Amino acid sequence: MKIIFAGTPEFAATALATLLKTEHEIVAVYTQPDRKAGRGQKLTASAVKQLALEHNIPVYQPLHFKSSTEEGLAAQAELKALNADVMVVAAYGLILPQVVLDTPKYGCLNIHGSLLPRWRGAAPIQRAIATGDTETGVTIMKMAAGLDTGDMMLKTICPIEATDTSATLHDKLAVKGAEATVQVLESEESLQKYLAEREVQDEALTVYAHKLSKAEAQINWSQPAAEIDRNIRAFNPWPVAFTPLDDSNNLRIWNSSLSTQQATAAVAGEVIALDKDGVHVMCGDQNAICITNLQWPGGKALNAVQINQTQKLSLGYKFT
């Protein structure tokens, strides 16, 4: 089949790379415009664009598809001229109006990083970890105009491990999403079958995964240890959990685990142990977490061994 692929970050690039191994023809790639990135603020192509260029696939980077502007109408016409059978969308980042969704022969399919209708929205991976879900997955859906409201064609489950961060879970789901997409698109007959058997989402089960903010990454040490640990792992790699230091700078905390250390007289936020595993800090429910990876202001991220070598923290230190 002739496929248009629309996506931007690594999550999408994983799916594109897998599709490129099939016999389908990727007639075009749509991705976000190049953005400034890094310390040098150089214009940088998205992961999807870089992969497309490596395979000599035409790349389109419209700002939008709005029917109210000449630019949007031109983008719509450009896409229509590709005469694609289907369009696969994964973390593209642009709103697609109904006219675009209806352009390919079989419409547009989306790879979403949750088991819909749970965790519709911008941050499904992070919210699943932070909430304490024990499993998540990917959903392949036929796109509709609403936010992640399309009919579900295939769902694949992925367990959430106690050690998972958003980074590690992202990578697992990217692979599962790619595999599920190839399964649906195994043949034109296969696609027709999945479309015919698609399932409407139950609105009563909808939970929204609202966009992350930097402010919510500040650790509240009065919370239970399990909740703090989940938040730390959910906010890795962005926005990264942090706690203020005495000098008004922030200590970034990249990873943690639940601790078995006890200290009956300790208060929430107090360092109760430092050992080969990391820094053990008391939380609001009189259980502790173990910080296993942290970053001092202006420095690099340190593992447990490196943390102890710096000797910057001591027993009794109190995070606020």
Segment roles from a protein language model:
Residues 1-237, 298, 303, 315-320:
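One-carbon transfer enzymes
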Residues 220-320:
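An anion-binding loop in the catalytic cleft
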